[in-house]
């Protein structure tokens, strides 16, 4: 007898159970086979470029969307949701609308250092009401290779004088990776006294660098520059440079020199104050006379030196006639808001101004009088010479025009020959009559020492008759030629005749 089979009413439920179990086992097998694969462990992208993050799934089961996150844990940031949301910087690599598409890679455009981090591709299973995270990829670390910003160099807040040490700082930000090189230069010469720090110390999406250098100032640093140079892997070509001009940092104090110039006018002395080698140009000068302010002025027209410093000169006219005593002149300079520096000069007043003026006038008058005397003397000398020459000519002409002679008559008086024959020596005499014409008076004060005389000599002769001898004396031949007239008196001279009377 055949065994009885299952009742027809019980066969339906059993088939349903078998089908359900079969479906359950197949679903579990699909879930166990699903894998989310992120093949790239890290991606390095330059700032401004587009980063591609790859992700694939091995199965479409379970049903549910794919989402991208940056970071893990509760604070993770949603980057892309396949199901919903608006993400303008994110695009998918493949067309997710295609059937059986299992490529869930994305692209992120215009990358910035802030985008750096680890990105995760996560598979969700459809649930009600919310989807449930099913499986996540291993993650891809996105590194942004960012260029450093242009270095900014800053100096001290206040100016410093030469021989002082000042500090300069250099800063650059937003670069990645962390490795960076920084150097300092002054006028092309590398500096060694500086310290550099890169922050933060640990991992970060971007970094900053800060460096401080020490520089010793000199008087020639007005045109000098300090340079901060930054080199990074993201830079192509020359490194970045930041500069600072030492002209914004240095202050060169002036040197003063006060000198006295020659007198420009009567009783006025020019005193100059030369302000040399100063920087910057801001300068105020004050003149003091014996401590009292005389004039204040601001440097306007200055002369620039080759080293960038300036020169300026101020002058002061001092009226010495207004001072009885010596004057102390002071040139006081205030430069760039600093305490005033000064230089003094003592102006000597040797005598009372009026006496000095009188002496000067007397000297001028004496000089003029001497000149007048010289001129008058020369003229008088010429006139006297002409007058003497004229007198000489007149006198010569008068003498030639006279034409008369001086006659001398010698008389022998009556004598009683018989009465006086007894006398062996006859007495003979001569009467010398020398007629003279009037001479022109050459000068009132001129003496006329003129002597005319006759000498009679007797000598023994043989006895003979008395002889009467006449002698005519020509005045023309007796007169010597007179010397030329001169201011001195004429020398005296003598005119004489010798008559010899022989005895009989």
From Swiss-Prot:
Residue ranges of the motif SH2-binding: 429-432, 453-456, 470-473, 496-499
Q: Where is this motif: SH3-binding?
A: 439-444
PTM comment: the record says: N-glycosylated.
Phenotypic consequence of residue 132 to T = Requires 2 nucleotide substitutions
Q: Which residues lie on this side of the membrane: Extracellular?
A: 31-373
Task: State any single GO MF term.
Answer: protein antigen binding
Q: Per the record, where are the segments of Basic and acidic residues compositional bias?
A: 336-355, 409-421
Q: Name the residue ranges with Polar residues bias.
A: 446-467
Short name of any one Pfam family annotated for the protein? V-set
Enumerate the InterPro entries for this protein: Ig-like_CS_Receptor (IPR051755), Ig-like_dom (IPR007110), Ig-like_dom_sf (IPR036179), Ig-like_fold (IPR013783), Ig_C1-set (IPR003597), Ig_sub (IPR003599), Ig_V-set (IPR013106)
Cytoplasmic compartment: which residues? Answer: 395-504
Topology relative to the membrane, per the entry? Single-pass type I membrane protein
Residues linked to a glycan: 245, 270, 292, 319
Which residues does the record list as Phosphotyrosine (modified residue)? Answer: 429, 453, 470, 496
* Subcellular localization, as worded in the UniProt entry: Membrane
- Domain (Ig-like C1-type): residue spans on this chain: 148-247, 254-348
Q: Name one GO biological process term.
A: negative regulation of ERK1 and ERK2 cascade
Which region is the signal sequence? 1-30
What GO CC annotations are associated with the protein? cell surface; extracellular exosome; ficolin-1-rich granule membrane; membrane; plasma membrane; tertiary granule membrane
Q: From the record, give the transmembrane residue ranges.
A: 374-394
Ig-like V-type domain mapped to chain residues: 32-137
What biological function has been recorded for the protein in this entry? Immunoglobulin-like cell surface receptor for CD47. Acts as docking protein and induces translocation of PTPN6, PTPN11 and other binding partners from the cytosol to the plasma membrane. Supports adhesion of cerebellar neurons, neurite outgrowth and glial cell attachment. May play a key role in intracellular signaling during synaptogenesis and in synaptic function. Involved in the negative regulation of receptor tyrosine kinase-coupled cellular responses induced by cell adhesion, growth factors or insulin.
Q: Which PANTHER family match?
A: SIGNAL-REGULATORY PROTEIN BETA
Record's subunit section: Binds PTPN11 when tyrosine-phosphorylated, except in macrophages, where it primarily binds PTPN6. Binds GRB2 in vitro. Binds FGR. Binds JAK2 irrespective of its phosphorylation status and forms a stable complex. Binds SCAP1 and/or SCAP2. The resulting complex recruits FYB1. Binds PTK2B. Interacts with TRIM2.
Q: What is this protein called?
A: Tyrosine-protein phosphatase non-receptor type substrate 1
Organism (species): Homo sapiens (Human)
């Amino acid at each position: 007898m055949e065994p009885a089979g299952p009742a027809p009413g019980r066969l339906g439920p059993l088939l349903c159970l078998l089908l359900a179990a079969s479906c359950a086992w197949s679903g579990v097998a699909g879930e166990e086979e699903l894998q989310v694969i992120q093949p790239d462990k890290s991606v390095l992208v330059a700032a401004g470029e587009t980063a591609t993050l790859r992700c694939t799934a091995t199965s479409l089961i379970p049903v549910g969307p794919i989402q991208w996150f940056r970071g893990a844990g509760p604070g993770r940031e949603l980057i892309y949701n396949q199901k919903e949301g608006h993400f303008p910087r994110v695009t998918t690599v493949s067309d997710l609308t295609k059937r059986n598409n299992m490529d869930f890679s994305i692209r992120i455009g215009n990358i910035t250092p802030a985008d750096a981090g680890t990105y995760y591709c996560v598979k969700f299973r459809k649930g009600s009401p919310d989807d449930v995270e099913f499986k996540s990829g291993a993650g891809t670390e996105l590194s942004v290779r960012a260029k450093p910003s242009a270095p900014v160099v800053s100096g001290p807040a206040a100016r410093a004088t030469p021989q002082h040490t000042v500090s300069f700082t250099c800063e650059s930000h937003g670069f990645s990776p962390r490795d960076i090189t920084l150097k300092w230069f002054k006028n092309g010469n590398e500096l060694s006294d500086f310290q550099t720090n890169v922050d933060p110390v640990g991992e970060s999406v971007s970094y900053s660098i800060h460096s401080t250098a020490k520089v010793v100032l000199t008087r020639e640093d007005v045109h000098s520059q300090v340079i901060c140079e930054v080199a990074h892997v993201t830079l192509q070509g020359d490194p970045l440079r930041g500069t600072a001009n030492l002209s914004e940092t240095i202050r060169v104090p002036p040197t003063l020199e006060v000198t006295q110039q020659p007198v420009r006018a009567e009783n006025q002395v020019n005193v100059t104050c030369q302000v040399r080698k100063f920087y910057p140009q801001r300068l105020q000068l004050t003149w003091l006379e014996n401590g009292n302010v005389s004039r204040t002025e601001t440097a306007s027209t200055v002369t620039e030196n080759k080293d960038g410093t300036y020169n300026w000169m101020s002058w002061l006219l001092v009226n010495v006639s207004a001072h009885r005593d010596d004057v102390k002149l002071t040139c006081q300079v205030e430069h760039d808001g600093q305490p005033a520096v000064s230089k003094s000069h003592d102006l000597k007043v040797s005598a009372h101004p009026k006496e000095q003026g009188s002496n000067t006038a007397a000297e001028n008058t004496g000089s003029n009088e001497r000149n007048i005397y010289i001129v008058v003397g020369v003229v008088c000398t010429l006139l006297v010479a002409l007058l003497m020459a004229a007198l000489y000519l007149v006198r010569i002409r008068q003498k030639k025009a006279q034409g008369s002679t001086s006659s001398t008559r010698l008389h022998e008086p009556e004598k009683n020959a018989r009465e006086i024959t007894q006398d062996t020596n006859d007495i003979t005499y001569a009467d010398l009559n020398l007629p003279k014409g009037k001479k022109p008076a050459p000068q009132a004060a001129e003496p006329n020492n003129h002597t005319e005389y006759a000498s009679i000599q007797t000598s023994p002769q043989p006895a003979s008759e008395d002889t009467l001898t006449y002698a005519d004396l020509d005045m023309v031949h007796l007169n010597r030629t007179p010397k030329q007239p001169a201011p001195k008196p004429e020398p005296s001279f003598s005119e004489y005749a010798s008559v010899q009377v022989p005895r009989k």
